[in-house]
From Swiss-Prot:
Pfam families: Ribosomal_L1. Part of the 50S ribosomal subunit. SUPFAM superfamilies: Ribosomal protein L1. GO terms for biological process: regulation of translation; translation. Signal peptide: none annotated. One of its GO terms (molecular function) is tRNA binding. GO terms for cellular component: cytosolic large ribosomal subunit. The keyword Ribosomal protein applies. Keywords: Repressor, Ribonucleoprotein, Ribosomal protein, RNA-binding, rRNA-binding, Translation regulation, tRNA-binding. Binds directly to 23S rRNA. The L1 stalk is quite mobile in the ribosome, and is involved in E site tRNA release. This is Large ribosomal subunit protein uL1. The gene is rplA. The keyword rRNA-binding applies. InterPro entries: Ribosom_uL1_bac-type (IPR005878), Ribosomal_uL1 (IPR002143), Ribosomal_uL1-like (IPR023674), Ribosomal_uL1/biogenesis (IPR028364), Ribosomal_uL1_3-a/b-sand (IPR016095), Ribosomal_uL1_CS (IPR023673).
């Protein structure tokens, strides 16, 4: 443990907390300092010039990163008949109706994403208090309430990332792993920032992208020069 602590302390040593790094330099700095003994997640955090307490300043959406997140995503699908079979063929981990409802209601939720066909939303809607707080409630705006379960499952498995601004105006997400190349991480960052930019609400006033930073699970954070993200 002492040796691991020294490695982590060393990773923080020469990071300039006041400097705004270019995207290329930030990715390199974070990647080379991800020294934990596991494949650390590379995370992005954006401070936005919005107040999500107002409905016209909510930022929410979904983006499919070009290189995925490196995370194995378990997908549950509420579907029946042919749609249930489509979901299974597409690679869904769990497919069901009342049985899946009962499992969720009992707290057995070994999955990361929930998809539902429109005809079963009457059933799924009753799980709002269970799925909602976990960010798992299917939503047509996010493509998780759909008759096209094949595409929805494929997108989820490919590394589609859902985002939503928090109370303090912050959006954060994992955009890859330390084992990714610098080029792939940079491309994922650009794709995520582009999605956030396109999701700018009409009610937003002043500077929208106020601050962007990158970090790894156990490593230091660095601030990005927003101008290099265009």
């Amino acid at each position: 443990m002492a040796r691991e602590g020294k490695r982590l302390k060393s990773a923080y040593a020469d990071i300039d907390r006041d400097k705004f790094y270019s995207l290329a330099d930030a990715v390199k700095a974070i990647k080379t300092r991800a020294v934990a003994k596991f494949d650390e997640t590379i995370e992005i955090a954006l401070n936005l010039g919005v107040d999500p307490r107002h409905a016209d300043q909510m930022v929410r959406g979904v983006v499919e990163l070009p290189h995925g997140t490196g995370k194995t995503v378990r997908v549950a699908v509420f579907a029946k008949g042919d749609k249930a079979e489509e979901a299974r063929k597409a690679g869904a981990d769990i497919v069901g109706e009342q049985d899946l409802f009962d499992a969720c209601n009992a707290g057995n939720m070994d999955f990361d994403r929930v998809i539902a066909t429109p005809d079963l939303m009457g059933l799924v809607g009753r799980l709002g208090k269970v799925l909602g707080p976990r960010g798992l409630m299917p939503n047509p705006k996010l493509g998780t309430v759909t008759a096209n379960v094949t595409e929805a499952v494929r997108a989820a498995k490919a590394g589609q990332v859902q985002f939503r601004v928090e109370k303090a105006g912050i959006v954060h997400a994992g955009i890859g792993k330390a084992s990714f190349s610098e080029e792939k991480l940079a491309e994922n960052v650009k794709a995520f920032v582009d999605a956030i930019t396109k999701a700018k609400p009409q009610g937003a006033k002043g500077t929208y992208l106020k601050k962007v930073s990158l970090s790894s699970t156990m490593g230091p954070g660095v601030k990005l020069d927003v101008a290099t993200l265009a």
